[in-house]
From Swiss-Prot:
Taxonomic lineage of the native organism: Viruses, Riboviria, Pararnavirae, Artverviricota, Revtraviricetes
Entry similarity comment: Belongs to the SKI family.
InterPro entries cross-referenced by the UniProt entry: c-SKI_SMAD4-bd_dom, DHD_Ski, DNA-bd_dom_put_sf, SAND-like_dom_sf, SKI/SNO/DAC, Ski_DNA-bd_sf, Tscrpt_reg_SKI_SnoN
Gene Ontology annotations of biological process type: negative regulation of BMP signaling pathway; negative regulation of transcription by RNA polymerase II; negative regulation of transforming growth factor beta receptor signaling pathway
Designated name of the protein: Transforming protein Ski
Region called Disordered, residue ranges: 308-365
UniProt keyword Cell inner membrane, yes or no: no
Highest rank taxon of the organism: Viruses
Molecular function in Gene Ontology: DNA-binding transcription factor activity, RNA polymerase II-specific; RNA polymerase II cis-regulatory region sequence-specific DNA binding; SMAD binding
SMART domains xrefs: c-SKI_SMAD_bind (SM01046)
Annotated SUPFAM superfamilies: Putative DNA-binding domain (SSF46955), SAND domain-like (SSF63763)
GO terms for cellular component: transcription regulator complex
Record key words, sorted: Oncogene
Length: 437
């Protein structure tokens, strides 16, 4: 093909036309001995779907967020907060010139978008911008954190370090200090000193690179090696530093890792006023002595006053659940004529009274204080649910002891005169008589 096209004055197009003409002559039957080459028809290219167009999020719902202790108005666009840039420049970054701010934005590759007409109108109505403002820039919360961290904050020296010898800063190694790291904006490793975490803004994490101290919410923005300036960051909030700071992977021992992880969780739980961090409690955190005491109390509460104890079935998870009590053995009673039905009835009544008193005393004395409803504490659905579940497992004799007939104990129990209702005197009045006029 290449040789023929080069020798032809028409180039490849002329050769293709001549080759097609020769194939046409062969199809007409001039040379039937040679096989005819049938090419499959060329399929047209598939129709490519058009680009997926999605309308941009033009949310006009204004909300507020906290940036470096200042309240900034923002709009939630695309799932992330976009802050009012003029408000940041006039409050948080008021000590910096526009030239300094622009240079940092260029270095960190921070892009600021423009708000829509509706968003601009809302900011004007709320008094955040003057009515003469032609436009307003919006910056994401993530980029605002990066910008403020680059301009505002630097680390502090360790408490036992002399500033004159700042080139030789040593690590603040204590009995409880351990290594941590984060993976935000290029990663950074540090040494956490729990003893120094005395307030939410206390510098308690020492960077292993520059040896300066940072608060937890500033350490997660701090980085040295790769700043990830060409990475699109989304959804960062320094207030969520409890989720960003992790235990160092240098600790491989199981016991050491568990101990340091518990120290890190205790540190994260401090000053958590909004209860954002909730660690998973272990399944059995009670000591064996406390568990044994609780099991004994539970067995005592389920004691059958009639003479037998409740049966506890062990579940697959190791817990013991009471089951129905075994059927009491019937004593053989000789049907003799000397035993009168009146004495039998009295014995039944006395046994019922003993079972009633013992069950009530034991149920009052053995019920856990948190399971008992108090008149000075509001009702809790969890407590009532636990009591309801516990009552379903109690033996039938204890459950049914509160339901009895007072009439059956009239002969065995002396009446309480002090609590008896006052006797009402019957007033007999003569019925009115009809008078006939």
């Amino acid at each position: 093909f290449h040789l023929s096209s080069m020798s032809s004055l028409g180039g490849p197009a002329a050769f293709s036309a001549r080759w097609a003409q020769e194939m046409y002559k062969k199809d007409n039957g001039k040379d039937p001995a040679e096989p005819v080459l049938h090419l499959p028809p060329i399929q047209p290219p598939p129709v490519m779907p058009g680009p997926f167009f999605m309308p941009s999020d033009r949310s006009t719902e204004r909300c507020e967020t906290i940036l470096e202790g200042e309240t900034i108005s923002c709009f939630v666009v695309g799932g992330e907060k976009r802050l009012c840039l003029p408000q940041i420049l006039n409050s948080v970054l008021r000590d910096f010139s526009l030239q300094q701010i622009n240079s940092v934005c260029d270095e960190l590759h921070i892009y600021c978008s423009r708000c829509t007409a509706d968003q601009l109108e809302i900011l004007k109505v709320m008094g955040i911008l003057p009515f003469s403002a032609p436009s307003c820039g919006l910056i994401t919360k993530t980029d605002a954190e990066r910008l403020c961290n680059a301009l505002l904050y630097g680390g502090t020296y360790p408490p036992h370090c002399k500033k004159e010898f700042s080139s030789t800063i040593e690590l603040e190694l204590t009995e409880k200090s351990f290594k941590v790291y984060h993976e935000c904006f290029g990663k950074c490793k540090g040494l956490l000193v729990p003893e120094l975490y005395s307030n939410p803004s206390a510098a308690c994490i020492q960077c292993l690179d520059c040896r300066l101290m940072y608060p937890p919410h500033k350490f997660v923005v701090h980085s040295h090696k790769s700043l990830e300036n060409r990475t699109c960051h989304w959804g960062f909030d320094s207030a969520n530093w409890r989720s960003y700071i992790l235990l160092s992977q240098d600790y491989t021992g199981k016991e050491e890792k568990a101990r340091l992880g518990q120290l890190l969780d205790e540190m994260k739980e401090k000053f958590d006023y909004n209860n954002k961090y909730k660690r998973k409690a272990p399944r059995n955190r009670e000591s064996p002595r406390v568990q044994l005491r609780r099991n004994k109390m539970f067995k005592t509460m389920l004691w059958d006053p009639a003479g037998g104890s409740a049966v506890l079935q062990r579940q697959p998870d190791g817990n013991e659940v009471p089951s129905d009590p075994p059927a009491s053995k019937k004593t053989k009673i000789d049907d003799s004529a000397s035993q009168s039905p009146a004495s039998t009835e009295k014995e039944k009544q006395s046994s019922r009274l003993r079972s009633l008193s013992s069950s009530s005393n034991k149920s009052i004395g053995c019920v856990h204080p948190r399971q008992r409803l108090s008149a000075f504490r509001p009702w809790s659905p969890a407590v009532s649910a636990n009591e309801k579940e516990l009552s379903t497992h109690l033996p039938a004799l204890i459950r049914d002891s509160s339901f009895y007939s007072y009439k059956s104990f009239e002969n065995a129990v002396a009446p309480n005169v002090a609590l008896a209702p006052p006797a009402q005197q019957k007033v007999v009045s003569n019925p009115p008589c009809a008078t006939v006029v």
